[in-house]
A protein has these predicted regions:
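Short hydrophobic alpha-helix segments
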Residues: 17-18, 197-199
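Extracellular/periplasmic catalytic domains that process cell-envelope and extracellular macromolecules
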Residues: 35-36, 60-62, 81-85, 147-150, ...
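Extracellular/periplasmic periplasmic-binding protein-like sensory domains
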Residues: 55-130, 193, 199-203, 207-218
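Extracellular/periplasmic Venus flytrap/periplasmic-binding protein
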Residues: 1-62, 98-107, 111
Length: 218
């Protein structure tokens, strides 16, 4: 739904959709369905093994498209599974780049991580956990009355925003997202991840009037 909503707001539409059975890596049918539409981008919603299988197979069949994964996939796991086939695969993230210490929050995260264990590698999951921990601590400081679940949630929903290392988090009843920011990363040839700091315009294929094509696999 999120992909469709984002596309509609930009006068774009899906041109194909492929599916695979959960917990399997049989993605051939999805690939052949999608390949016929000649998409410029494939938005992938799934676990890292089937997504990696799809990308490798797509490259074998010379599908010239940008492969975009959401953070659920697990960036490091996907990069490792893909190997050299992972070059230029894009992954969205819900937290800033964990190695960008120019961001105050990330710098504070590095200091906390190092103080706990200098041998632990920074990562997206632990940074997200650090942010949640900071949020809970700040919420408890603001909480009035007994520290019950109800009072804690009420504090989070009504006393925001929460400023954590230069980044603001806001919550409300029915809105537990905290941040509306989306951070993009791209897999490098050596399997490492790099932050995407700016986007260049793509040459799109017009379908009808101002509509452009994209596709979704899930």
């Amino acid at each position: 739904k999120g992909v469709r909503k984002a596309l509609a707001s930009r006068n774009m539409r899906l041109v194909a959709r492929g599916n695979y059975a959960r917990n399997l890596t049989a993605v051939h049918s999805a690939l052949f369905t999608i390949r016929k539409a000649e998409p410029e981008a494939v938005v992938m919603v799934g676990a890292y093994r089937p997504n990696a299988a799809f990308i490798r197979l797509a490259r074998t069949f010379e599908l010239d498209a940008i492969f975009i994964n959401i953070s659920f996939v697990g960036a490091k796991a996907l990069a490792k599974e893909l190997g050299t086939a992972g070059k230029e695969v894009v992954i969205s993230q819900v937290v800033p780049f964990p190695w960008d210490t120019d961001i105050k929050l990330v710098s504070e995260y590095h200091k906390a991580l190092s103080a706990f264990n200098k041998d632990i590698e920074p990562g997206f999951v632990s940074l997200e956990g650090y942010i949640v921990g900071r949020l809970i601590i700040e919420s408890l400081k603001r909480l009035k009355g007994e520290p019950t679940r109800e009072n804690l949630l009420n504090t989070i929903y009504t006393s925001g925003p929460f400023e954590l290392g230069g980044i603001n988090l806001s919550f409300a009843e029915g809105d537990n997202q905290g941040m509306d920011n989306v951070y993009l990363t791209v897999i490098q040839e050596d399997g490492s991840l790099q932050s995407v700091n700016h986007l260049l315009p793509l040459t799109k294929k017009p379908v009808k009037d101002n509509e452009y094509e994209t596709i979704l696999i899930e």
